[in-house]
Amino acid sequence: MTDNFDIFRKYIAQGGINENSTGSDKVVKIQLLRRGKDNVNLPAKNYSFKTYYIDSIEKYDKSIDEIRECCRMFGLRAYISVNIKSKKDVQMESLKLISSYVYDGNCQKPWGIIDRSYDLARCDDKRWVIDIDAQEDIDLASYVEDISTVIETCKSSHDKNIICGAPSKSGYHLITYPFDVCEFEKRMEILQADKWKYSADIPDIKKNGLSILFEDI
C-alpha cells in the first residue's frame, strides 16, 4: 500500500493552496485511474474513474476517506498533479478550447474540457516528477540518495532542486524544480559507470507529471 496524503498535504499548502477556498486562486488536480495492469480481467486500457479539483486544505482533508474507499473498492490508483495551477488560467484555457471546438464544429465529449484545460494551463512555478524504479538486489534508499545528489549538482534557477520525495508502488518519486536535463543524463551515465550495479535506465523525468497519492492494490 502507498499512502502519501500527509506528504502532499504539506506540499500543496506550501504551493499556495489555502486552508479554505475563500479568496484563493490556486487549484490542484487529483485523478483516480484504473490501470490495465492492475486489473487483469478488465480491458488493458487505462481508465479515468474520477477527477477532483482541490482548492483548499479543507476540501483536501474531506476527500481523503472517499478517495481511499474508491481506490480499494474499484482497484484504482489516486494520482496528484505536482503542478498547482491558477483557476483563472484554467478558465482562460477552457474559453480557448470551447471557442475552437465551436468554430471547428467539434461537439464530441465536451465534458473533457476542464481536464484538458488544467493540463494546458501555464504554471508559474513548474515542477517535475523524477520516477525512480526499485532495482533487484539494490538498496532503494541508497539509490535514491545517489540520484538526489546528482540532481542537486545540476544547473537550475533554484538554490535547491529537490522539493520533496514520495514512495511509489514500484519505487520512489522525487518532486523537483526544472534543472539541466543534459547535465543530469551525463552525470547519471558517470554514476552508472562508477557503480556498475546501477544498470537500469536513467529515471524518467515527467515534466507535466502526476505523483502517486494512494493505492492499495
Positions of the model-derived regions?
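A common structural junction motif
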Residues: 155, 188-200
